[in-house]
Amino acid sequence: MNACHFSGWIPFAPETRYTPSGRKIICFAARVCDERGAESILRFQMDGDPVAPLPPELAPGRAVEIEAAATTQAVHRPDGRTVSRLVFHVTRLAASGRRQRRPGDSPLQLALF
């Protein structure tokens, strides 16, 4: 695993999934910016307490600092091809205030996990 650090903001609400064994997985996205100023949306996963509410740091519009471990995962497609996907597992999540909306930003964004 490779350790990564990201600064960004949460563009839309997270999604909660449960494994067959009952483990809670929180899937969320963050819009991050690289050193050249280019923005990307990255998807993250983190373990959650099965009975606890979602962390307030994951509220849409919240600025966050994320430390994650990156792993490569094989994905088998319906057409028979196997491709690799980079998966980020969160090791630390910290809020850093609210993001200031820029002119031209859409107030609604859709997440597909």
Which functions belong to the PLM regions below?
Residues M1-F113:
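Single-stranded nucleic acid-binding surfaces, predominantly the OB-fold ssDNA-binding core
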